[in-house]
Amino acid sequence: MITSIVDSIHQIPVAEWERLARPAGLYLSHRWLAGEEQDPTATSAYCLVRDLDGTLLAAAPLYLVRDEPNDSYQPETVLPPRLRPRVIAGARRGYHNTPLVGPGQDACLTRLRDAARRFADRHGTTHWWPYLTTRAATALAPLYPDPPLHLGDDAFIPLPGTGIDDYIASLPARRRAGIRRERADFAAAGVRVRHQPLADCFEEAGALLAGHQRDHGHDRDGVDAMTALLERQAAAMGDEARVVAAHDAGRMIAFCLYYHYGATTWIRAVALDRGHPAPHLYFNLMYYLPVEDAYAHGTTALHAGMTTVEAKRRRGADVSALYALADRHPGAQVTGGVLDTPPPADRQSPA
C-alpha cells in the first residue's frame, strides 16, 4: 500500500472519492469538502491510501486549525485539559465523522493514523477525531492511547414507506395524534411555505440564523458572519443546498437548510423568529416539511443531528453515541492523569 498527502480535494477525482464518501455522509462528500477549503480559519490536506495499482482504499481530510469559531470543535471546550490538538482528522463540521475506508480495508486505519501523526508533528501539534460515530470509534480506538470520549448523541429518523403518512403511521398512537395536530395547527396559521435554493435567500436566512445563534449565547456569530457563511455554502453546494422557509407578510420567519445526499436527508441549520405566533413553527420546519421533501427525493432517513435528543426520539429517531479520539505527543503517556515519559514501546512514532 502507498500512503500520500495532497493539498486539495480537487487533486482527487470526484468519482474516486465519492465511492468511499457516499456511505459515510454529507460532511465527507467531495463537494462539501471543496467548500470547506474556502474557510480561512484552517488549512486542509487529504491523506490517501492506495494499493499498488493505484486504487483508493482509504482516505481522511486533515485540518490544521488556526482559529476555531465553533465552540463544539474547540479542544479546550470538549477535551480534557492535557489534550490540545490543533489538527482535526476527518470531517470538521456536521457533528458526524468517520474515516473513509473501503469494505474489508480496516488495516488501512493504521496508515491513516500514522499519516495524521506525521502531518500534525510537522506542525508541532497532535491530531484528534471529533464526533466519531460509534462504529468508527470502535474501529479506531485500539490505535490510540486513550479510550474514546463521549461527546454527545446523534439522531437519525427512519423514513419507511413512500410518504409522510407512512412515517407518521410508524410512530406510537399518541405521537401520531400529536404530530397530526402540530401539522394541522401550522397549516391553519396561514403562513406561506416556500422551497428554494439557498443561493436565492442566504441574506434573509443569515439574519435569522444570527438571531438564533445570539439567543444561544454565540455573540460572535453576527449577521455579517452568518450571511457570509451561508453565501459561501451556497456558492460551494449550488442547487444541492435546499431551503424550506416560512414567510409571513413578505418576511421570512423561519427556515431549514438541508441536503439530500446518499440515502439520507441531512438537516444543516434551522432558525426562526421566536416572537412569531405561528404554532409549532420549529417542529414543522425542523421535521415535517423536510420529511415531506425527503420522501419526494427518495431518501430513507433524516439526519436530525445532536441536541434536543428526547424530542427527536419522540419523533421516531434512532439515537447513537458520538465520540472523540485524541492522540498524544510522541514520548508522552498518562500516569494518574498527568503526562509523563517515556512511552511504552507500542506508542512510539510510527515508521
Predicted regions and their residues:
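Solvent-exposed, well-ordered amphipathic alpha-helical segments
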Residues: M1-S4, V14, V49-L57, L64, ...
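A conserved beta-strand-loop-helix scaffold within acyl/acetyltransferase catalytic domains
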Residues: I2-T77, T126-A278
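Generic structural "secondary-structure junction" signal
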Residues: Q11, V101-G102, A169, D327
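Acyl-donor binding region in acyl/amide transferases
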Residues: T43-A45, V65-P147, T264-V319, A324
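Noncatalytic linker/hinge segments flanking ATPase motor cores
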Residues: S44, P85-R92, D166-R176, H195-A199, ...
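A broadly tuned preference for mixed-charge, low-complexity surface segments
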Residues: A59-Y63, R93-L109, A173-R192, V244-H247, ...
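Active-site/acyl-donor-binding loops of N-acyltransferases
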Residues: L64, A141-L171, D248, H297-A351
